[in-house]
């Protein structure tokens, strides 16, 4: 409402100014102080001045609205930055203590969840759609603040994440992999081998929106980019969804072979070869962990994991 009123007042002031200006010009011509021939150029200058005045007032109103939005965004960013508890005596583990989160208070996506992800271990996170698998990764990364409970990590800057869909730029593969931190060509070539793209050249242009690549190749470039700048914790959210089974298994195996990194791997795919290599499989249902254990243990129990796997839901 304030912005609308500001715009209306500026229009009234501009119209009043132009009316007074025209009256003054008319009186000057009437009393012989101004030649009629100069009237049109003066009117044109007046119109341009009024137009610029209107633009300035409109921009001021726009700046006011942006300022309000910017203030709200900064508050949101500040709250997200304080979502997790960053501990100076961090021992490498990620601890979730009675964490609850929902986009609305009436429906919790994560419900009173407690778990400790131990440093260097590899965790598969499975479950049906909407069970909270991807949400828990976003909470750990600090995308959203937990409404209840604590999430203890060292710092979100020490967490890498690979999303289901990668975004790339109309540039060379080298620049797409390097981003803000430049790596050696040797390192970048190893990252391309990691995602089974050894034939790609670093100076090769990707094209606008990856037009020179297939969807699977775009995703693999995104994975290689994260591997090139790997942090202590690696979060993976359905990263092989667009890949064929053989390529997906190869990349999953290489991620599982990482020695020191803690890996949280959300997946819907059920490759026995890779699932057996995870230190622990967590089964999510309605925002809670309903089962956990090794592949062999969960298959032997014939519970929720067994059912999901046989139905092809993971």
Q: At which residue positions do the language-model features occur?
A:
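A hydrophobic transmembrane-helix motif
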Residues: 1-46
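Cytosolic ends of transmembrane helices, especially the final helix of ABC transmembrane type-1 domains
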Residues: 42-76
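Helix-to-loop junction immediately C-terminal to a conserved catalytic motif
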Residues: 141
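C-terminal portion of ABC ATPase nucleotide-binding domains
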Residues: 276-314
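The feature captures the beta-strand-to-loop junction immediately N-terminal to the Walker
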Residues: 126-128
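Conserved "ABC signature" C-loop
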Residues: 166-208, 230, 304-307
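Catalytic Walker B motif of ABC-type/P-loop ATPase nucleotide-binding domains
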Residues: 234-238
